[in-house]
């Protein structure tokens, strides 16, 4: 059975035993407030669904996730729960395996998101990095 929720910054699709969460926040799929809220909600739903045996996180467009949304820096949206570290805890504590499908440039918080998953797969054009360390920011 296929179930889909196609509106919003994260698209949820359940195809049989696999839940696919697609970050859909153009142009680079940043971890903006709405994305964090939607990811957390869908992760919790998939973890509670007895029919779901595994979860895949991918990105629409050219990459998985470009990291934090710099437009939210120094704004109240930056502190809205769940914060990125809360998402990492949800990923790591999941009883179901979570796979990050990495493609394109996956940087900063996007790489941290992928590292929080149990498994990672990448296409041959994927690139990863933590550019914030060049500015003295510790991930």
Regions of interest found by a model, annotated:
Residues 21, 57, 69, 113-114:
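Hydrophobic/aromatic residues within transmembrane alpha-helices
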Residues 91-135:
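Glycine-rich beta-to-alpha active-site loop
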């Amino acid at each position: 059975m296929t179930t889909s929720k196609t509106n919003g910054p994260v698209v949820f699709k359940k195809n049989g035993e696999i839940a696919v969460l697609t970050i859909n926040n153009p142009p680079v799929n940043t971890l903006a407030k709405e994305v964090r809220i939607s990811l957390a909600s869908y992760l919790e739903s998939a973890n509670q669904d007895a029919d779901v045996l595994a979860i895949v996180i991918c990105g629409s467009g050219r990459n998985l996730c470009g990291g934090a949304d710099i437009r939210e820096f120094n704004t109240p949206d930056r502190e809205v729960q769940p914060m990125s570290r809360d998402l990492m805890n949800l990923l790591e504590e999941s009883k179901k395996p979570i796979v990050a499908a990495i493609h394109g440039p996956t940087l900063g918080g996007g790489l941290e998101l992928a590292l929080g998953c149990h498994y990672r797969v990448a296409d041959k054009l994927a690139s990863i990095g933590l550019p914030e360390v060049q500015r003295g920011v510790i991930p």
